[in-house]
Amino acid sequence: MCRCPLEHHEVRMTSAEAIAVAGSAQEHGRPKWPPDKPQVLGQPALARVVVAALVWLLAGASMSSLNKWIFTVHGFGRPLLLSALHMLAAAVACHWGAQRPVPHSIHRRVLLLSLTFGTSMACGNVGLSTVPLDLAQLATTTTPLFTLALSALLLGRRHHPLQFAAMGPLCLGAACSLAGELRAPPAGCGFLLVATCLRGFKSVQQSALLQEERLDAVTLLYATSLPSFCLLAGAALVLEAGAAPPLPPTDSRLWACVLLSCFLSVVYNLASFSLLALTSALTVHVLGNLTVVGNLILSRLLFGSHLSALSYVGIALTLSGMFLYHNCESVASWATRRGLWNRDQPGKGL
């Protein structure tokens, strides 16, 4: 986990974003970099972050592979319907767990999040149904770049300079991986690109509602799941009613996979919301790049996918960018000891 300075949000951290510092710096407008006394995440909060991250990574990798299995092996040609079922499962699961109603003052923000949530999920599943699993996962590695830009533009958050540097290998690695897998349909790649952009926007919205408005993960997921379900169910009814082949009602294996996919979706979304409440939108998506390796292995084992040499170079670059992002303070300290980085003069550095 990155040890960059953290925001004063009780036990919550903004990971490597360091958007707030102590009083005197606030009087002069934008906070200085770096803060004098960075906060350290307490052991209980750190344990919650680790558990939520592990659950999120495992559920995400399993759900992506299972969804691809449903689309490919069972011929389930209804990605919008599957997305709607995911949202319905979230609404049912969170109905009794929501702690309090959403304040009326933020209803519009919640509805906007629901629209972004549902659209990103639909585009992701539509893209996944048409392209190989490995390519679908590699496309998501550019999400941290969109999240970094949106958090700076929309929320005014400041980032460690090395975090911007880490976006280079992260996105270059994704570009190399995509260049090595150009056999995929252009339409599927387009849906994946839209889903990636919307996923970054969604995380910024979630982070603001969870941390600034103090909503809990279950309440926010419940509030967004019902509007998202209505949106996705309507889209599935209009776009997939006559286009996809009829569903086999007696295929017990298919419906068992669909139910398991819905369960994994609920677990994944709850863990994602919890991570956003404890860390930040950018940290979550950089962590999400870890699922790429797991899904590449599963894609090779389950579907016989093979990556080119350029794609493996892209994976190595992506992992190096992740290392730089999560260890920006350690890298900066190492460079400072060798005279390559001057903390007091941000203009002079690596």
Swiss-Prot record:
Job of this protein: Putative transporter.
Keywords: Membrane, Transmembrane, Transmembrane helix
One GO BP: transmembrane transport
Main location group: membrane
Topological category with respect to the lipid bilayer: Multi-pass membrane protein
Pfam family membership, one: TPT
Family named by the database record: Belongs to the TPT transporter family. SLC35E subfamily.
GO cellular component: Golgi apparatus; membrane
Organism (species): Rattus norvegicus (Rat)
Protein name: Solute carrier family 35 member E4
GO molecular function, one term: antiporter activity
UniProt KW Transmembrane keyword: yes
